[in-house]
Regions:
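N-terminal V-set
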Residues: 2-32, 73-75
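Extracellular/luminal immunoglobulin-like beta-sandwich modules
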Residues: 8, 15, 53, 57-80
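Extracellular beta-strand/loop-rich beta-sandwich domains predominantly from IgSF
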Residues: 16, 22-57, 64-66
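Active-site/binding-pocket entry motifs
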Residues: 31, 80-81
Length: 82
């Protein structure tokens, strides 16, 4: 069950672990864990104010054996606000 598993999100371009379980491991306050209360299987990564520099591959990992993982490509369209 997902209740006894750790879900982590990693940014692939620099291998930076952004979140693990409910903890955020980046000083960039735009990142947060999205985990609706009562839904143990839903773990998302929220990024507010995405910028072109944020584009790239992000990977969700679950500490199962073997490890479960799913990659997501973030594409940012539009102009960057200054």
């Amino acid at each position: 069950s997902f209740l006894d598993r750790q879900v982590s999100w990693m940014r692939s371009k620099d291998l930076h672990i952004l979140t693990s379980h409910v903890f955020v491991f980046t000083s960039d306050g735009r990142f947060a864990v999205s985990h609706p209360e009562g839904d143990s299987a839903s773990w998302g990564l929220r990024l507010r104010g995405a910028r072109p520099a944020d584009q790239g591959l992000y990977e969700c990992q679950v500490n199962t054996e073997p490890k479960m993982k799913q990659a997501v490509m973030l594409t940012v369209n539009g102009m960057e606000l200054i």
